[in-house]
């Protein structure tokens, strides 16, 4: 029997389980029929989708607040992508462009980029700012999720 991977719906926040061999194929939420995000990928949600994830997702949500013009932010992108693949089913990783979503940056009191915030059950579980090594970042994320 194949292993199941948990995925939170961007539409309703419901937790769905996808068979490992079905990852990458089109899947829809069992509750609201919204297409599900592919597990193991960094998501770029809308403000509304992020609000749903923060409030309703059963999985912790790691938010990367970044800017396209920030070199340390770009340096962290492959590290985040690797983390999303490794922690698929245990952690959702999302990316928020602070220039495109200034209201979100303000709501989260983002003062520098990159800033990483882990949300669990609608509450902030931790935050850190600045680029770091893949090992340090993975240890930090694991300690909070």
Name each model feature, range by range.
Residues 9-12, 29-32:
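Short cysteine-rich clusters marking metal-coordination/redox-active sites
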Residues 13-16, 36, 77:
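Cys/His-rich microdomains that often coordinate metals
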Residues 18-27:
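Short linker/helix segments within small regulatory modules
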Residues 43-61:
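A short beta-strand-turn-helix
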Residues 44-45, 65, 80-103, 110:
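Thiol-based oxidoreductase modules, predominantly thioredoxin-like and allied folds used
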Residues 58, 65-69, 112:
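Short pre-active-site segment immediately N-terminal to redox-active cysteine/selenocysteine motifs
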Residues 65-79:
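Conserved redox-active cysteine motifs that mediate thiol-disulfide chemistry
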Residues 112, 117-145:
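Non-catalytic, surface beta->alpha helical segment in thiol-disulfide oxidoreductase systems
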């Amino acid at each position: 029997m194949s292993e199941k991977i948990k995925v939170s719906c961007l539409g309703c926040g419901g937790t769905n389980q996808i068979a490992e061999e079905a990852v990458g194929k089109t899947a829809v939420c069992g509750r609201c029929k919204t297409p599900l995000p592919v597990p193991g990928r960094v998501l770029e949600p809308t403000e509304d989708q992020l609000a749903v994830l923060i409030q309703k997702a059963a999985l912790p949500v790691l938010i990367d607040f970044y800017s396209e013009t920030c070199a340390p932010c770009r340096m962290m992108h492959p590290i985040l992508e690797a983390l999303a693949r490794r922690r698929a089913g245990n952690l959702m990783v999302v990316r928020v462009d602070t220039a495109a979503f200034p209201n979100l940056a303000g709501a989260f009191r983002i003062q520098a980029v990159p800033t990483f915030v882990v949300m669990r059950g609608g509450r902030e579980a931790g935050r850190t700012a600045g680029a770091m090594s893949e090992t340090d970042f993975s240890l930090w994320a694991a300690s909070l999720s």
